Each structure stands twice: as C-alpha cells, then as structure tokens.
Swiss-Prot record:
[4Fe-4S] cluster binds at residues 426, 432, 471, 475. The gene is cysI. Alpha(8)-beta(8). The alpha component is a flavoprotein, the beta component is a hemoprotein. Siroheme binds at residue 475. SUPFAM superfamilies: Nitrite and sulphite reductase 4Fe-4S domain-like, Nitrite/Sulfite reductase N-terminal domain-like. It holds the Pfam family NIR_SIR_ferr. The lineage of its organism: Bacteria, Pseudomonadati, Pseudomonadota, Gammaproteobacteria, Lysobacterales. This is Sulfite reductase [NADPH] hemoprotein beta-component. GO terms for cellular component: sulfite reductase complex (NADPH). Its EC number is 1.8.1.2.
Length: 568
C-alpha cells in the first residue's frame, strides 16, 4: 500500500476507529476490510494468514487461513505471576498454545481467529495489560534494561520508561470503545491528539532505556535511546541518542540500517519534555510521501543532525548538556542466578527464539506456569527474547530450582555452544506476511550445523553473536550481529558479518543470496582464522575488522559508535 493511501486512511479514520466494528461483525470472511487491516495495527494486532496452508487452500478455492497476531504493550517486559497465568490461559484458549517473547520485551499471541479477537483483547485487558500502540505509526513498546544488579536504579529506570510509555499513548478512545465496550461520548472521533496529530507519525517509533555496562536493549538501534547515567546507585539522568533503526529494503541503495547518534545529557526531570520534542519533530519533519524513507533515521540524514538537534532543543526549551562518560561491555544476557544489591536473586533462562510452548521435546509452557503458580517474584522479558524470574528471596530459590529441573527450563542455558545460547531470530514463516525465508524455525537447525565447526576450532564457548531475520526489516536486529542471516528467498540468505558484541557497529554484506551450504563454506575458514589469530578476549566481529576481512558498510549514514569517545 502506498504512503499516500496509508496517510489517507489514518486521516479519515475518526481517530483510529475506521469501520473496525463492521469488519469484526462481518461473518462472511475471516479477514478485515482493507483499510481496517491498517488501523488494527494501532490497536496492537496484525492480520496474517498461515502461509504453510496458502497453496492448499487456493487449490480448494478457499480464502487464506486468516488469523491475527496480538502484541502486548508491556514496558520493560515486566509482569506479575498472576498476569503470567492469565496470559498463559489466553494463549491456550484463543491462540496457538504458545507465548512468544519479542525483541522489544512484549508478548505475541499467534493464531487468533477473527470471531475470537474481541474476546481475546478483553481477556488481555482483564490481566491489566493492554495492546494499544503495540503496532502502527506510533511509539511502540518501550524497552528497558533487564539489569537485576542495580536494583534501586533499575526501579527508577523502569518507572521513567513506564511513565514515558503512558505519556506517548494515543489520546483517542477508539481502543476502549471497540474492544472494551466503552460508550461513545460527544466528540468521539475528533479527539485532540496533542502529540501525534490527526495523521499520527510517518512510521513506527521505537524507544529504549539502557543501563551500562550492559546494552541488552541495543539502544543505538532505537529511534530514541536513553543511556542511564548512574552514580553511587543513583540514577542522575540520561545520555540521549537519536536516529537508530534496522529496517532496509533489499537492493535499494536509498535505504539502510543506522546506529543512533549521542546528542547530549538530560536530567530525569527533562525526560518527558525532550521526548515530546523529539517525537513531534519526527511527526512534522518525517517523510510522509515515501514510506520506505519515513523513519526518523532518514529524517536526520536528509536534514542533517545539527538541524534536527537544534529543532529539538528549540521545541523543548532545553539546551542539552555534554554527554556523560559510559562504557558498554556487551549486549547479551547473563544466564543463571545473579544476586542483586538488595539480597534478592534473579534467574535468567535462555529461550529458543523466545518461544514458550509445550512441544514433543519441550515443556516450557507448563514449567513457567508452575513457577507462576508459586506467586513469588516477577517475570521480566529481556530484549534478547529470554525470561528473568526476578526478585526471589534466598529461601525461595530451591522451589524455583526444582521446577526448572523438572521441566527442563534451563535447557537453553545448557546449549552446547555459546553462539546457540545467545542467538536470536524473528518469527518469520509461517505467520509473518513479510518473511522471505525461515528464521525462528530455522534457527535450531542452523545452530546444529554450525556446532561441529565451532567444536572443530575450539570455539564452542566463544560468545559469537548470531541473529537470523526472515526479511530485511530486521526485527531481530540482525545488522548489529557478528554473524547475521537476512532472508532473500526460501532457503537463501544474505550473509552479514562484522557487528560487535556491544551493539555499536553495523555489520557488512559478505555474501549475497546464498544457500546454507554456501553459508557454512564461507564461515568455516573465517572461524578457523579467528581461532588461530584472535587476540585475548577479541570478539569475532572485532577480529574481522582488525584483520581487514571486513570493513564498515558503505551506507551514507552513521555506522559505528566509537567506544573511545564514550570513556572518561
């Protein structure tokens, strides 16, 4: 759909109402009307179909097996045990019997059919969780560092992020009328949208809060990032980054991924003001005529960083202070038990591509249900698609450990390679309409193919960062990985190499449109050289750059955040 069509739909939608009620009530199809397929995204859902069944249903002269993905708005991915049980029940009753943890710390339900869409939405809201603005041209789910060590500062970080998430919600009552049966009042459909305006943003907008030395949120991949400045366990404020983004288009030189620029420091008191100024700057300056160039990163590249920063400061009435020193050491999760400063313990468990389900070889859904039934602590989803069972007292650990062992919840932690423990993949086939190749379903097979090569060169415990994406939109943040596969066609991928383990450098296209056999053949000699010639503690991506095998990608944009400029 063209940019003009989408802008027209938004403008005529009566603040995101459209004809959704009529589409939902239409019994002759499992789909929504065309314009409503756009509008439902703002309510937290995508219309999809089971692509595994497309050809068979076409032969039977049936419409596609339409279904809906629903995504939660859970800032920082924090939920209570009771909420976990409610989401588990929803997944079992209305979806495909699985919970999917996303790279933005939300949950996705897949396989919901239209006639149960409203009931499912109501059940999610009954858990005191909503889906408003989880998709669409608005601010999406706000990421927050899942850092269990700095307990007090992390609590303040989460409070700020949750406050900002609420502040940036659309003002329309459409969500509550359509899904929760709120009565319309005079003026419904004409509510003021003081932040978004009648056409909302040109494209989606993503925000992340990071807590050094860990960059688990990949803060430089966000349109707007906040890097916590913590001194003596007190959160003083944030270094602000703008202009990150992963999406691109295969073969189009006018699109590219980008890492954000650090533009200065703010105190906590200025968080809402500066964020509003940044979002409204993108609202007014972003490209609404060419959708593939509508993200904030292109607004900055087209108009210039100095111009955009000047506009932000003018709107906010704030002069940004010089950025404070900080260092990121890595962007992964730390598995196993970790003690926080307050004496509580936190258990991080690695999930295969974020999928929580009971399958022939796994009882993850049942196991986490049993832990939630204990009613202790809380659950935190990580930006790496994993789960933290957080806030556990020393005396409660044994009960958790027993269930972890019984249900094999730490199987991911015990994966035979470090690469496998840290790898990520987007959902891709069969539900994502944009997928060109497999990702989540392919990840375990590809890990298994890489394992003997890694073991051959003594690299089984080398923390090499692998990410797989089914298309170039990059939901798994592949362009920051040391090794990335980006889908081109069924069974074929672009092989990207040379990111780092800190989320600060874009990788580079190494081989284009190649098969698994060709990917493994390309990687083996590089891994062999890495084993022989790497420096102590040198990452694979850093090695590729130091030895000249890989250079920065030729994008006309910001490609690398230099660590030396960030240190005192």
């Amino acid at each position: 759909m063209s940019s003009s069509s989408i802008e027209d739909i938004k403008g005529k939608s009566h603040r995101l109402r459209g004809s959704l009620l009529e589409s939902l009530a239409n019994p002759t199809t499992g789909a929504l009307g065309e314009s409503d397929q756009t509008l439902i995204k703002y309510h937290g859902s995508y219309q999809q179909d089971d692509r595994d069944l497309r050809e068979e249903r076409r032969r039977q002269k049936l419409e596609p097996a339409y279904q809906f993905m629903i995504r939660t708005r859970t800032p920082g991915g924090v939920i209570t045990p009771q909420q976990w049980l409610q989401l588990d029940a929803i997944a079992t009753r209305y979806a495909n019997h699985s919970l999917r943890v996303t790279t933005r710390q939300a949950f996705q339900f897949h396989g919901v059919i239209k006639r149960e869409l409203k009931t499912t939405m109501q059940a999610i809201n009954a858990a005191l969780i909503d889906t408003l603005a989880a998709c669409g041209d608005v601010n999406r789910n706000v990421q927050v560092a899942a850092n269990p060590l700095l307990s007090r500062a992390h609590a303040d970080l989460y409070t700020d992020a949750a406050h900002l998430s609420e502040h940036l919600l659309p003002n329309t009552r459409a969500y509550y009328e359509i899904w929760l049966d709120e009565k319309k009042v005079a003026g419904a459909g004409e509510e003021e949208e003081p932040i978004y305006g009648p056409h909302y943003l040109p494209r989606k907008f993503k925000i992340g809060f990071a807590a050094p030395p860990i960059n688990d949120v990949d803060v430089f991949a966000n349109d707007l990032g906040f890097i916590a400045v913590i001194v003596d366990n007190t959160l003083l404020g944030y270094n602000v980054t703008i202009g990150g983004g992963m999406g691109t288009t295969h073969g189009d030189p006018d699109t590219w991924p980008r890492v954000g620029n650090i533009i200065g420091f703010i105190t906590r008191a200025d968080l809402i003001t500066i964020s509003t100024a940044i979002v409204t700057t993108q609202r007014d300056f972003g490209n609404r005529t060419l959708r593939k160039r509508a993200r904030f990163k292109y607004t900055i590249d087209d108009r210039g960083l100095d111009c955009i920063v000047g506009e932000i400061q003018q709107r906010a009435g704030i002069t940004l202070q010089p950025a404070r020193p900080f260092v990121f050491e890595h962007n992964g999760d730390r598995y196993g038990w970790i003690e926080g400063e307050d004496g509580h313990w936190h258990l991080t468990l690695s999930l295969p591509a974020g999928r929580i389900a009971d399958t022939e070889g796994s009882t993850l859904l049942s196991g986490f249900r049993e832990i939630a039934q204990l009613g202790i602590g809380e659950f935190r989803m990580t930006p790496n698609q994993n789960v933290v069972i957080a806030g556990i007292s020393p005396g409660q650990r044994a009960a958790i450990d027993a269930l972890v062992t019984q249900y094999g919840l730490d199987t991911g932690n015990r994966a035979p390679t470090a690469l496998g423990r840290h790898a990520m993949a987007c959902v891709a086939l069969p539900t994502c309409g944009l997928a060109m190749a497999e990702a989540e379903r392919y990840l375990p097979d590809f890990n298994a193919k890489l394992q003997p090569i890694l073991e051959k060169y003594g690299l089984a415990e080398a923390p090499i960062l692998l990410r797989i994406s089914g298309c170039p939109n990059g939901c798994s943040r592949p362009y920051l990985a040391e090794i990335a596969l980006v889908g081109k066609a069924p069974g074929r991928y672009n092989l990207m190499l040379g990111g780092d383990q800190r989320g600060q450098r874009l990788n580079t296209l190494y081989r284009e449109n190649i098969t698994e056999t060709e990917i493994l053949a390309a990687l083996e000699p590089l891994l062999g050289r890495y084993q022989q010639k790497r420096l102590p503690s040198e990452g694979f991506g850093d090695f590729l750059h130091r030895t000249g095998i890989i250079a920065l990608p030729p994008y006309p944009t910001h490609r690398h955040v230099i660590s030396s400029t960030l240190q005192a």
